[in-house]
Amino acid sequence: MAFAIATAASFPEVTLAAPTPAPADSNALVRAALEAPRHVSYVGQIQTIRWGMRNANATIQRVEHLAPSSTRRTFLAPEALYGEYDITLGTTTTKIDPKQHRAMISENPSSDNAITMNTNIVLLAANYRAVVGPVEIVAGRPATTVSLVNRFTGERMMRLWIDNSTKVVLAKEAYHQDGSLAWRSRFDEIRFTGEIPSGVFATAIPQGFQEVEGRRFGDMSDDLQRTLDEAGFKAVNPRYLPDGFKIIGAENSSFRGLRNLHLLYSDGIRTLSLFENNADSEPDFGGVKPSTTHFEGHDAEYVKDGPTTLLTWREHGLAFALIGDLDLKKLTAIAISVIP
């Protein structure tokens, strides 16, 4: 079984008086924010902090985005990542690591999949209340705050700062179920312009760099039965999902020569992926040392990275990996319901 976990200072906030939109306007504002990157180009610097179990990790990146779907992110800090960058053109991402002289190319058609985006928007409206707050200043620009409150638990799961003019999200915070902060991203500065040199998005691999195979996702399909039939083994769907989660797509992907069935679930904000394969291979935790756990007579391993948890186990000749923005208790409950 092979998989990878993908991961990403506080500033004073000035509050201005502003009228509070009606609920219908709140939902329209969130949808506009989701769609803004398809229409708005910009250059800026963004800071991200992720809180783990023992410490916090902070990064600073220069972001250059040319609508609708070209983005370059270059690490400025910490020093260990300085100079690394990735370029996403549509559904293809090229990651360049100058220190290791290594390049990785990944393919994910679902990143530009209208089915996935529209389904998430519907789930977001069904499972979360968009509560508009005051206007605050982010990167020198007025931005409307919107809290996304889970309808089942009453907990705020995410807060957005949406630029009043362009509707681009200038800052974002995500929270654990206990209300503690999981991660925060915030533009220190941003300039809206479409005049970005084409060379910024050049993806030619530098001479002498080793090309490492990245993950090659298939096109996420809403034809679940066809995807299951093409998996090559009898696939299993979980019998339990947390409130609000629905399956939004499935695909058969390949990574390092290993074929995986990928089932994708979402509640509009949080995502959950279940990977299955029938290969006799060891999990790849990307250099992170896993912890062990047990359930229903199974030995399992897991790792946590901020709000994201990854749980792996084997059963009846199948290898399973669950990864999502949920705690171990919730993932274990889902795993117990996966019965081959």
What residue ranges belong to the model's regions?
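Acidic/charged, solvent-exposed loop-and-adjacent secondary-structure segments enriched in E/D, K/R, S/T
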Residues: 94-116
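Short amphipathic beta-strand/extended segments with alternating polar/hydrophobic composition
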Residues: 58-62, 84-89, 104-110, 185-187, ...
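Extended beta-strand-rich segments in extracellular/periplasmic secretory proteins, especially
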Residues: 118-175, 207-262
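A generic structural motif
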Residues: 77, 100, 110, 149, ...
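Surface-exposed amphipathic alpha-helical segments
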Residues: 166-168, 175, 179-199, 316-340
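N-terminal mature ectodomain segment of secretory-pathway/periplasmic proteins
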Residues: 14-101, 126-177
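Short, solvent-exposed recognition patches
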Residues: 52, 60, 102-105, 113, ...
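Bacterial N-terminal signal peptides
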Residues: 1-10
